[in-house]
């Protein structure tokens, strides 16, 4: 398992390095170099993630039936091809097509990687291993963001094209690294519906609750920077300091927090506590607009992000345990693909929702958002118990049938 973990971590680190460089430069590349409007970029990326969300379950099912390692390798190659194709984009329609291909490949790759992890790692260790991969991912994103920052400083067409080349090369490299892992045999063909997760209402509820909790992502990446610039006296460089604090917190503490989650009861409690901590973080962010001292505002914001990091660590550790444990072992791909749609939906719907809520309503909006986090956290334990009862009474329809 030690060698497999190192290989999984290396693949995650390489891919996320490319992601980090792409994420910090893509908007300016599409607007400044390609010449599209901000609205066109927003619509295209939203459509891309929407298509990706729809593709997650069938691609996860493909990983179950054909073997997750091979499917993950192919989808990493597809992601590399999609990123490279952005070089050819000159107008909006091709941009939408490539964005859809990119979103599909990325979402499917995530599902296949989770299925691969489930196939290589014993159930008792999956959450801890997933936490290690998350730490590697955040480290890679930080390195990639630094590379992207260099391209932003140069601000030339060649620099942005170099970022796309680096991103494509990173996913190509990740595919080659994944080939070093042992093959996980395909799951046996089973009786019952092919995409069983689409009929699993308790799992759908758990996924919905997790999606609400995942609104912390656009909160941190979009709303907090806007709030700092428009509603507080803090200097704009505070944004970088807050993102650095978040990244460092995840890299340093995610594995430690995940070690405390051992089973569904611990996982449910972890998500519930995450909701409470996120409520506190929203309250602190709201307070940062009071007063005119830049240093006081900055200190309050740092306290808010520290709370947000704790909530993120608790949420991630609990959600991973829940998503793996409630999924049948022979359907991990499609179940992880479905659970992963929460990330795509939060990225797709979160910016507009939170901008209206927080930037439109101010302090009241922060309170409403915090109560949303609290409500979702409190709802998770009974939802998990419902799903667990459903697993206990499921008839033996998942036995393998001869093909």
Give the predicted meaning of each segment.
Residues 1-50, 202-246:
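Helix-loop boundary and gating motifs at the non-cytosolic
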Residues 1-6, 181-213, 402-403:
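Juxtamembrane intracellular "pre-TM" segments in multi-pass secondary transporters
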Residues 53-90:
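Conserved MFS/SLC helix-loop-helix module at the cytosolic interface between two early adjacent transmembrane helices
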Residues 54-67, 152, 252-271:
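Helix-to-loop junctions at the C-terminal end of transmembrane segments
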Residues 70-85, 168, 269-285:
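Structural signature of the two symmetry-related core transmembrane helices
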Residues 98-139:
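Cytoplasmic helix-loop-helix junction between adjacent transmembrane helices
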Residues 149, 169-187, 379-383:
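C-terminal membrane-cytosol helix-exit motif in multi-pass small-molecule transporters
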Residues 269-315:
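C-terminal transmembrane helical hairpin of 12-TM major facilitator-type secondary transporters
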């Amino acid at each position: 398992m030690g060698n497999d973990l190192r290989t999984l971590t290396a693949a995650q680190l390489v891919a996320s390095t490319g992601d980090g460089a792409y994420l910090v430069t893509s908007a300016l590349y599409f607007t400044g170099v390609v010449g599209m409007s901000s609205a066109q970029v927003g619509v295209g990326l939203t459509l891309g993630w929407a298509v990706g969300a729809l593709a997650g379950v069938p691609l996860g099912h493909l990983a179950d039936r054909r073997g997750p390692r091979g499917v993950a390798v192919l989808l990493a190659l597809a992601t590399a091809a999609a990123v490279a194709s952005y070089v050819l984009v000159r107008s909006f329609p091709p941009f939408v097509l490539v964005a859809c291909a990119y979103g599909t490949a990325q979402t499917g790759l995530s599902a296949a990687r989770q299925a691969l992890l489930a196939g290589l790692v014993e159930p008792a260790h999956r959450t801890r291993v997933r936490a290690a991969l998350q730490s590697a991912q955040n480290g890679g994103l930080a390195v990639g963001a630094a590379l992207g920052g260099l391209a932003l400083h140069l601000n030339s067409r060649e620099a942005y094209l170099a970022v796309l080349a680096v991103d494509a090369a990173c996913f190509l490299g990740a595919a080659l690294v994944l080939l070093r892992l042992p093959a996980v045999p395909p799951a046996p063909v089973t009786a019952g519906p092919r995409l069983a997760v689409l009929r699993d209402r308790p799992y759908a509820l758990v996924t919905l609750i997790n999606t609400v909790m995942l609104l912390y992502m656009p909160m941190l990446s979009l709303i907090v920077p806007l709030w700092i610039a428009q509603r507080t006296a803090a200097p704009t460089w505070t944004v970088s300091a807050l993102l650095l604090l978040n990244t460092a917190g995840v890299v340093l503490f995610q594995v430690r927090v995940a070690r405390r989650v051992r089973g569904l009861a611990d996982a449910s409690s972890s998500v519930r506590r995450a909701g409470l901590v996120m409520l506190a973080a929203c309250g602190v962010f709201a307070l940062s607009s009071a007063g005119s001292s830049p240093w006081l505002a900055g200190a309050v914001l740092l306290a808010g992000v520290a709370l947000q990091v704790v909530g993120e660590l608790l949420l991630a550790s609990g959600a991973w345990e829940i998503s793996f444990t409630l999924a049948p072992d022979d359907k991990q791909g499609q179940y992880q693909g479905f659970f992963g749609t929460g990330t795509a939906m939060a990225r797709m719907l979160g910016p507009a929702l939170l901008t209206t809520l927080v930037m439109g309503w101010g302090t009241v909006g922060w309170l409403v958002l915090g109560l949303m986090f609290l409500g979702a956290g409190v709802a998770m334990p009974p939802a998990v118990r419902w799903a667990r009862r459903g697993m206990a009474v499921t008839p033996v329809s998942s036995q393998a049938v001869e093909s």
